């Protein structure tokens, strides 16, 4: 719900329709940001003004959203969750069996802006990497790049856990492709 309103602010540029107690009126972007519900309107999320621009970019324009056919032998699926906050992340990789390189990657995440941004950023990191290199990615790299605050580090940990789970699933389908 709030995400659509954030998009409205960005798309409309200089004005936004605002339905207040006295009817609908057009207000400027600065006022729209002050009056329209932001990401921070949800108790599970920090206010948008506290997010780093890279988080907002990956949240509003997530890369590689979608699913791959989990039944394909060269697709690994990692499904992880954080019971503390309710975030759930599914990350899928499609691997070239001959080279061991991740050629395609998709994700679906139910969670806060930081979880979505961490998922999106992880997909960019792993595409084109070997399984061995992808398995070496640490949550600290994601957290540093996205400037996640300490309270959101679990989101980057989910992304690390998801890629490791996807690699493990791929390897379980193809037992001869274990990491060294």
UniProtKB/Swiss-Prot annotation:
SUPFAM superfamilies linked to this entry: SufE/NifU
Domain of life (superkingdom): Eukaryota
Principal location: mitochondrion
Any Gene Ontology biological process: iron-sulfur cluster assembly
Pathway note: Cofactor biosynthesis; iron-sulfur cluster biosynthesis
Subcellular location: Mitochondrion matrix
Record family assignment: Belongs to the NifU family.
Main function: Scaffold protein for the de novo synthesis of iron-sulfur (Fe-S) clusters within mitochondria, which is required for maturation of both mitochondrial and cytoplasmic [2Fe-2S] and [4Fe-4S] proteins. First, a [2Fe-2S] cluster is transiently assembled on the scaffold protein ISU1. In a second step, the cluster is released from ISU1, transferred to a glutaredoxin, followed by the formation of mitochondrial [2Fe-2S] proteins, the synthesis of [4Fe-4S] clusters and their target-specific insertion into the recipient apoproteins.
SUBUNIT field: Component of the core Fe-S cluster (ISC) assembly machinery.
NCBIfam families: iscU (TIGR01999)
Official protein name in the record: Iron sulfur cluster assembly protein 1, mitochondrial
Gene encoding the protein: ISU1
């Amino acid at each position: 719900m709030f995400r659509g309103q954030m998009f409205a602010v960005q798309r409309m540029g200089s004005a936004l329709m605002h339905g207040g107690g006295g009817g609908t009126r057009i207000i400027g972007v600065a006022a729209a940001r002050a009056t329209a519900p932001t990401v921070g309107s949800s108790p599970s999320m920090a206010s948008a003004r506290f997010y780093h621009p890279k988080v907002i970019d990956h949240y509003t324009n997530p890369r590689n959203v979608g699913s791959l056919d989990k039944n394909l032998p060269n697709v690994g699926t990692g499904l992880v969750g954080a019971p503390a906050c309710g975030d759930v992340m599914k990350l899928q990789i499609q691997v070239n069996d001959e080279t061991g390189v991740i050629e395609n990657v998709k994700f679906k995440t139910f969670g806060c802006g930081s979880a979505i941004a961490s998922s999106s950023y992880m997909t960019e990191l792993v595409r084109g990497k070997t399984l061995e290199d992808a398995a070496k990615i640490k949550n600290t790299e994601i957290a540093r790049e996205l400037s996640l605050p300490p309270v959101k580090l679990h989101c980057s940990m989910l992304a690390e856990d998801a890629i490791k789970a996807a690699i493990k699933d791929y390897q379980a389908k193809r037992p001869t492709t274990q990491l060294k």
